């Protein structure tokens, strides 16, 4: 029997029988145990020891930066081989090669494969199934893209991790965490790589890839200690929206999850809050969580729910991914399947002129409050194209609404468009189920391009309650489009009451918001690093500052935010940040887990090789002390201002 196989069998045999409240998947029963570590040679045991048993070797924790592959104290090839042998499968440890390496001179260059890859490069599925790719490639450092998209001259790892563990068991995750912590290696977590800031990448890191933890269990009547009794679904960390929605539909229920097909629901999405086509009906995805299974920074596998690790449970529901631990599964509430009516329409300025075009857009803005008061969700874009502009609704999504009810909601807007002589050809469809509607109506979201940065803002209901407020907010959005920037927007209202009045870490700005708006800034693909930095700063301090100015005291959605967001602690969590920081210090005082703009990330920074904000560089400490950070956070507990109109 091989060493890794014996460790799996021993760990499984030593696991106690779980209580009814802790139903574990098979892969969660395969765990690393102290009993097994005690059988290893001392040198090997030290590599994989749990935190409370580990005595740091000299200088292992004294360095300013996490060790990098060209450092003398980077783990030896022998150490990496030992890690690979301990994992639950012989191929679990991956030394990654970028997909686009087939396009560059080298041993795997293949022009046919390069052509095929390039043709499918913007398809998100191309990147989701890869252990290292992310959907915001600008944060990888652009060191290996297909040359016709971005020619880097050669192909290097850049911001991709040096090693990846294809996690198939809790054992794999525990070994990865312990190895990285004990050897001073940067650790990152990748599920699907959707995060707008590139949190799933990291040069010189060991990455834990949770994408293949796909188990799903349905409970017809789940009895939770929180008082909830009803249907529920437990899903592995790697389960994506298209898989979760299908499983729910098969059992006649719906769950609160993302609109994007490829989003890894139980990873950073739900930990960051998670907005949904059902948010105006059932709140944020995080509001519907009943419990997490998680491996913490010490290597311990534990539960976080209403009765166990309650502080961690609070933090994981909205506090963000990549910083508190590695979630292996999540149990969420489910609701009865429902019919949905959806509508789509579009118009542009080509034949009607910009004045009438903007009057048509404003006509929809005037109905924001009415729409969300009826539990609807609108997903629309406003796109400049040269001298013209296009408004596209795809879709207006009305859960549990008949065709007539949805039509009546939209008729005032459509009547205004008719009065303005703006022609539209709306498509209005009633579906028998949420799943059918979601499949038919939401487009597949592509990978972002290589010369764009995004930012977002939550616009509160108060901004749209008066004519003056609507004018101010609409003006800020219009100015961005007139400056050449696309707007991607969501009209929804995940109010606290909609989510069942939970106490969790979700950004309080969400509770008063009825518009989540995203925009981006492009630059020339051949721009120098200095020009890119100038464009980024202009975007952050220009367009996004105008949005902040008209929404004082509000915030931004951390999963879809500007990486350079100023005062991000307040923007992502408001007055909840001080509590989150305390929980981070309690569960991960050594910052084993780090991600940009994550809770507790202030003490570290990526020193990128090109000086740009990306993951292509060493992770190093900065001079700011925790006490300084904490005192600044306390100031955030004071009430924040609102726009008075």
Model-derived regions, located:
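Soluble FAD-dependent oxygen oxidases
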Residues: 22-645
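Fungal secretory targeting signals
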Residues: 1-23, 645
């Amino acid at each position: 029997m091989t060493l890794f196989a014996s460790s799996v069998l021993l760990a499984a045999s030593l696991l106690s029988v779980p209580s009814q409240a802790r139903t574990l998947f098979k892969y969660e029963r395969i765990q690393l145990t102290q009993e097994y570590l005690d059988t290893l040679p001392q040198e090997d045991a030290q590599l994989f020891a749990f935190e409370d048993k580990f005595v740091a070797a000299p200088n292992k924790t004294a360095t300013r930066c996490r060790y990098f592959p060209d450092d003398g104290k980077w783990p030896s090839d022998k150490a990496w081989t030992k890690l690979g042998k301990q994992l639950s499968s012989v191929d679990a440890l991956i030394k990654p090669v970028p997909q686009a390496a087939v396009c560059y001179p080298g041993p795997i260059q293949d022009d046919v494969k390069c052509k095929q890859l390039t043709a499918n490069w913007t398809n998100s599925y191309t990147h989701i199934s890869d252990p290292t790719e992310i959907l915001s490639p600008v944060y990888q450092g652009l060191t290996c893209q297909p040359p016709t998209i971005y020619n880097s001259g050669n192909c290097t790892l850049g911001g991709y991790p040096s090693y990846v563990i294809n996690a198939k068991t809790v054992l794999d995750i525990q070994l990865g965490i312990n190895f990285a912590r004990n050897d001073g290696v940067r650790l990152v977590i990748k599920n699907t790589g959707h995060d707008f800031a590139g949190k799933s990448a990291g040069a010189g890191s060991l990455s834990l890839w949770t994408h293949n933890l796909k188990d799903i269990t349905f409970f017809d009547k789940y009895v939770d200690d929180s008082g909830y009794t009803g249907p529920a679904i437990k899903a592995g960390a790697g389960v994506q929206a298209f898989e979760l929605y299908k499983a729910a539909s098969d059992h006649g229920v719906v769950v609160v999850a993302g609109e994007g097909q490829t989003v890894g629901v139980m990873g950073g999405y739900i930990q960051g809050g998670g907005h949904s086509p059902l948010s105006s009906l059932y709140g944020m995805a995080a509001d519907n969580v009943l419990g997490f299974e998680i491996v913490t920074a010490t290597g311990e596998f534990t539960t976080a729910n209403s009765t166990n690790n309650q502080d961690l449970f609070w933090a994981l529901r909205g506090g963000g991914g990549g910083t508190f631990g590695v979630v292996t599964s999540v149990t969420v509430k489910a609701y009865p399947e429902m019919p949905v009516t959806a509508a789509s329409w579009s118009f542009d300025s080509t034949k009607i002129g910009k004045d009438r075009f903007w009057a048509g857009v404003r006509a929809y803005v005037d109905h924001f409050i009415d729409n969300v008061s009826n539990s609807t969700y609108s997903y629309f874009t406003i796109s400049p194209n040269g001298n013209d502009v296009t408004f596209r609704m795809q879709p207006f999504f009305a859960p549990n609404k008949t065709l007539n009810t949805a039509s009546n909601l939209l008729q005032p807007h459509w009547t205004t468009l008719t009065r303005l002589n703006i022609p539209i050809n709306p498509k209005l469809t009633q579906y028998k189920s949420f799943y059918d509607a979601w499949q038919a109506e939401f487009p597949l979201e592509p990978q972002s391009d290589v010369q764009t940065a995004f930012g977002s803002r939550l616009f509160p209901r108060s901004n749209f309650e008066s004519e003056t407020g609507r004018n101010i907010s609409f003006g800020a959005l219009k100015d961005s489009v007139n400056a050449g920037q696309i707007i991607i927007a969501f009209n929804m209202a995940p109010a606290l009451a909609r989510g069942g009045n939970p106490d969790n870490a979700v950004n309080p700005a969400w509770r008063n918001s009825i518009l989540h708006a995203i925009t981006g800034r492009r630059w020339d693909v051949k721009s120098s690093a200095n020009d890119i930095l100038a464009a980024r700063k202009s975007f952050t301090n220009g367009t996004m500052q105008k949005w902040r100015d008209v929404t004082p005291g509000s915030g931004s959605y951390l999963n879809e935010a500007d990486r350079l967001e100023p005062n991000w602690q307040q923007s992502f969590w408001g007055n909840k940040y001080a509590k989150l920081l305390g929980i981070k210090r309690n569960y991960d005082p050594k910052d084993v887990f780090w991600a940009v703009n994550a809770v507790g990330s202030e003490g570290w920074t990526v020193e990128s090789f090109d000086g740009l904000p990306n993951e292509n560089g060493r992770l190093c400490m900065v001079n700011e002390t925790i006490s300084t950070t904490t005192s600044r956070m306390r100031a955030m507990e004071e009430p924040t201002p609102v726009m008075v109109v």
